[in-house]
């Protein structure tokens, strides 16, 4: 075995140990194919710089799946996920690979990115479980096809948590959870989020801090659940959640 391959194997083992989950041969092949396609498409459109080595495996794959460590212990369970601002496909495509019985909706406002997401989903054999939508979160959250229709609504690195909450909560069914992926997380941010969630008829279920392997830093996951049906006026019109954020 070459030194590079040995290093990759060690790196992968660290990640799988951290997740307490390991991919099947088919799933590993899908991740590798996804990495290859990202590199290829990056030459056409600017998707992400995190495509090589640990950049891909730790900062993309592990960072996408670690917040779902509980769900990964039962990957056979069927859930409906929506990934808001999916961009280059993380965390949505990673979740689709890891959770073979779940359906994933990838939402992004950029038609270039959704073209990529459609092509990649087809190339790695996931198009039967992945739906790609070109639309703003504020519009999709009012669409009866999507509103109140998901077990999990997820966003990674989109905006501040109180803004993201207004995007996510309208998508949740009565037992659904919104998951906000963050780097650092402060008590001040938590208080603002609590106030925002009160207006959305939702609450923080819990927060959890993770340390990514390979010295990739700290991540926080905020899990949110609905208390009651999200008021019909949310999400507000395009741009308003960012310009006039809830929680102040």
Swiss-Prot record:
Keywords, in A-Z order: Cytoplasm, Methyltransferase, rRNA processing, S-adenosyl-L-methionine, Transferase
Known EC number: 2.1.1.-
Top enzyme class: transferase
Annotated Gene3D superfamilies: Vaccinia Virus protein VP39
Highest taxon listed in the record's lineage: Bacteria
Binding site for S-adenosyl-L-methionine: 85, 90, 108-110, 137-138, 156
Molecular functions (GO terms): rRNA (guanine-N7-)-methyltransferase activity
GO cellular component, one term: cytosol
One protein family per Pfam: GidB
Annotated compartments: Cytoplasm
NCBIfam families: rsmG_gidB (TIGR00138)
Family assignment from sequence similarity: Belongs to the methyltransferase superfamily. RNA methyltransferase RsmG family.
HAMAP family listed in its UniProt record: 16SrRNA_methyltr_G
Role description: Specifically methylates the N7 position of a guanine in 16S rRNA.
Protein name: Ribosomal RNA small subunit methyltransferase G
Protein source organism: Prochlorococcus marinus (strain NATL1A)
Lineage: Bacteria, Bacillati, Cyanobacteriota, Cyanophyceae, Synechococcales
